[in-house]
Amino acid sequence: MPAISRDEVAHLARLSRLALTDAELDEFAGQLDSILSHVKVVTEVPAEDVPPMANPNAVTNVTRPDVIVPGLTPEQALSGAPAVEQDRFAVPQILGEGE
């Protein structure tokens, strides 16, 4: 006999806004009972001395020094562009009329 009844599964399905058939209710009752038995095993692990944490590994940001380096000149940046207007990339208009 599952610890979770068919009615409890139906109630959970209603709360979750899931439309389950009678066969699905019976199937999920057994599956949820099995899942809860596995969760119970995990809760029995002695962990009183383990502090609460989000991640067991230390997480640190890996950054590089913020150093200014020379970039491309405008001419170099625009050299590969298919179309240029007024020292800018020219692209097809996609929104409304131009100004």
Curated annotation (Swiss-Prot):
Enzyme Commission identifier(s): 6.3.5.-
The entry describes its oligomerization and partners as: Heterotrimer of A, B and C subunits.
* The family this protein is said to belong to: Belongs to the GatC family.
Any one Pfam family match given in the protein's UniProt record, by short name: GatC
Q: Which biological process, per GO, is one annotated for this protein? A: regulation of translational fidelity
**Its catalytic activity?**
L-glutamyl-tRNA(Gln) + L-glutamine + ATP + H2O = L-glutaminyl-tRNA(Gln) + L-glutamate + ADP + phosphate + H(+); L-aspartyl-tRNA(Asn) + L-glutamine + ATP + H2O = L-asparaginyl-tRNA(Asn) + L-glutamate + ADP + phosphate + 2 H(+)
Q: Which domain of life is it from?
A: Bacteria
Gene Ontology MF terms in the entry? asparaginyl-tRNA synthase (glutamine-hydrolyzing) activity; ATP binding; glutaminyl-tRNA synthase (glutamine-hydrolyzing) activity
Name of protein: Aspartyl/glutamyl-tRNA(Asn/Gln) amidotransferase subunit C
Which EC class does it fall in? ligase
Alphabetical keyword list: ATP-binding, Ligase, Nucleotide-binding, Protein biosynthesis
Tell me which positions the record assigns to the signal sequence. none
What does the protein in this record do?
Answer: Allows the formation of correctly charged Asn-tRNA(Asn) or Gln-tRNA(Gln) through the transamidation of misacylated Asp-tRNA(Asn) or Glu-tRNA(Gln) in organisms which lack either or both of asparaginyl-tRNA or glutaminyl-tRNA synthetases. The reaction takes place in the presence of glutamine and ATP through an activated phospho-Asp-tRNA(Asn) or phospho-Glu-tRNA(Gln).
Task: Supply the Gene3D superfamilies for this chain.
Answer: Glu-tRNAGln amidotransferase C subunit, N-terminal domain
| Membrane-spanning intervals of the chain | none
